[in-house]
Amino acid sequence: MATSPDKINMEYYIGNKKENFAPINVYDDGEFTYFKMKRSFKDMPVVFMQEVDGNFTEVPVDVNDVTNGNNILKVRKVSKKIRFTVGKKTINIINQNYGR
């Protein structure tokens, strides 16, 4: 079932967009979070999402749309703060519409 357009949240801040593994944009449908990646991205980030208690937990990433050529990563969760990590590099992503 498709999500109606008024349910899509695209209010995300993406820090350090210059990194190769930084998403171009981020959006969610209230249940899943989607990360549109650059065509040139090579390093798969480890994705951490902030829990209600403030701690970050690594979450599984669905890469099905990457292998299909769409370059979209999907996480089965929505969170206020997200971290992409590759090696010692980290990108912080903030859901500016979380809880509204």
Predicted regions mapped to residue ranges:
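Edge beta-strands of extracellular beta-sandwich domains
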Residues: E58-P60, K88-R100
